[in-house]
Amino acid sequence: MGKDTIANIITYIRNADINKKGMVQLPFTNITEKIVKILLREGFVENIRKHRENDKSFLVLTLRYRRNRKESYKSFLNLKRISTPGLRIYYNYKKIPRILGGMGIVILSTSRGIMTDREARLEKIGGEVLCYIW
C-alpha cells in the first residue's frame, strides 16, 4: 500500500468492479471509513462491515450491481481521483463542479470534515476536491 490512501481506495474498488467481484476488502483508516460511509449514504455501495484479522482492521464493502438483459450484472460505479499529493486542487463553494448535472458526487475535504459537494454548498464552504464519483 502506497502513501496515497484515497487513490488506493479508488483502485481497490475499480479493480473489484472490473473483475466483477461482489466484495472489496479495504484497509481501515479514518479517511477510508468516512469516504465509504459517503458511498453508502449516496447509494453507490450496498453494505459496509468492519472486519478484524490478526490485529489489523479492514472494511468489507458489498458493491451494488444492476441487472441488465445483455449482461448478467453491470456496475454503475465510476471513480476518478482529482487532487493528488503532488497537485492539490481546491475550490470555493461557488466553483465546485457538478458531475453529470448533479447525478454524480464530488467528495471534498473541508475544514468541517469530508463531505459531498451538496453538503459543502449548503454549508457554504469549499475545500480540497478528493474525487469524483458517478
Swiss-Prot record:
One of its GO terms (biological process) is translation. InterPro entries: Ribosomal_uS8, Ribosomal_uS8_CS, Ribosomal_uS8_sf. It is found in: Plastid, Chloroplast. Disulfide bonds: none annotated. Keywords: Chloroplast, Plastid, Ribonucleoprotein, Ribosomal protein, RNA-binding, rRNA-binding. Pfam families: Ribosomal_S8. Gene3D superfamilies: 3.30.1370.30, 3.30.1490.10. Its main location: plastid. GO terms for cellular component: chloroplast; ribonucleoprotein complex; ribosome. GO terms for molecular function: rRNA binding; structural constituent of ribosome. The keyword Ribonucleoprotein applies. Part of the 30S ribosomal subunit. One of the primary rRNA binding proteins, it binds directly to 16S rRNA central domain where it helps coordinate assembly of the platform of the 30S subunit. Belongs to the universal ribosomal protein uS8 family. This is Small ribosomal subunit protein uS8c. It comes from Phaseolus vulgaris.
